[in-house]
């Protein structure tokens, strides 16, 4: 079930409502607020439902509820995330395409569709970790993908660390493939030391990322070059 907690300050304290939302079942809800101020609840499945003005209930009018049909029929387990960019609606979602999850998406001109399945924009993690649950935020003109991974806990992927990478779009609005970079986001001042594990791009072979201390994963990473002419680029 999905519950609601209310606070008068973003930092709380939050007071939970006595009962969960009526007519809503499942996990990993997403709230999307359109340009006109109308809020929608997005749930795995994938369904989009108008929220009432109190934000404590959803509309029971069938016309205010839409199931996105233009998605894979299997492997939709959790966490859809809806966002808007340049007037287009992007329904993004984790998809267990084979075994592990990728991130895929659909696009539409209207919130209730019809949507067009666009494919994958974030591949499975190399170590087969199921940690693609994500959100997408635009800040100061740049769009960012937030997700989590088990870089600090490879033996137990439930101890997940937050990751962020930039998202870029093609001229037709489609999302370019996002590759985890370990670079992080933001701009490094020219007079600051650069952490060399944070690369924008690396050569296809001859280098890798390793832990500074294999007994203490929180010590950070290093870039290891083991072939001539291997390189790492930081933008």
Task: Name each model feature, range by range.
Residues 1-234:
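Carbohydrate-active catalytic/glycan-binding domains of CAZyme proteins
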């Amino acid at each position: 079930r999905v519950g609601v907690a209310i606070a008068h300050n973003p930092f709380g304290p939050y007071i939970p409502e006595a009962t969960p939302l009526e007519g809503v079942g499942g996990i990993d809800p997403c709230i999307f607020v359109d340009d006109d101020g109308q809020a929608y609840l997005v749930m795995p499945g994938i369904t989009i439902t108008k929220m009432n003005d109190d934000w404590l209930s959803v509309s029971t009018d069938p016309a205010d509820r839409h199931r996105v049909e233009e998605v894979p029929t299997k492997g939709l387990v959790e966490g859809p995330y809806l966002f808007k960019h340049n007037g287009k609606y992007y329904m993004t979602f984790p998809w267990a395409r084979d075994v592990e999850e990728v991130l895929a998406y659909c696009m539409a001109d209207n919130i209730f569709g019809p949507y067009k399945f666009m494919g994958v924009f974030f591949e499975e993690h190399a170590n087969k970790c199921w940690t693609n649950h994500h959100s997408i935020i635009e800040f100061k003109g740049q769009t960012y993908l937030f997700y989590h991974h088990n870089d600090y806990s490879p033996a137990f992927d439930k101890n997940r660390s937050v990751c962020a990478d930039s998202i870029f779009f093609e001229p037709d609005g489609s999302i370019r493939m996002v590759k985890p970079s370990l670079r992080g986001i933001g701009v490094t001042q020219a007079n600051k030391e650069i952490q060399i594990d944070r690369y924008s791009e690396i050569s296809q072979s001859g280098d890798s990322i390793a832990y500074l201390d294999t007994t203490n994963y929180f010590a950070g990473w290093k870039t290891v070059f083991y072939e001539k002419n291997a390189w790492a680029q930081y933008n």
